[in-house]
């Protein structure tokens, strides 16, 4: 969660604004619709969730020895995370996301709206 807060719930690769996992789970519970679900696999998960679900991505892939700490993790949307997979930035021709300035927009992934959503 500290990765998402540091990055303002914004994908460091594409710039997509993301929703907090807690908000998405509360929203799913509130609307209780089979059309808006988070399953165990991508096939069981609504596309809107995949687009807005934040993932802590290893800049240096874990399978290549990348650490699981704030110095190697950035916020990613699920599509960017899945697309990057276990490849390095160099292999994919991507800029280092740590070189991008994080602009504090005060976007909190709608965490501040969870209480309202539950009422």
Where are these regions (language model features)?
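Short, flexible, mixed-charge glycine/proline-rich loop motifs
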Residues: 1-7, 65-70
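A boundary/linker detector
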Residues: 1-2, 8, 15-21, 114-118
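The −1 position to Zn-ligating cysteines in a subset of zinc-ribbon hairpins
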Residues: 9-10, 55, 76
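Short, cysteine/histidine-rich loop/knuckle motifs that typically chelate Zn2+
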Residues: 13-14, 79
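Histidine-centered nuclease catalytic patch
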Residues: 18-72
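Short Cys/His-centered divalent metal-binding micro-motifs
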Residues: 19, 73-95
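Intrinsically disordered, low-complexity, charge-dense segments enriched in Lys/Arg
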Residues: 90-98, 102-119
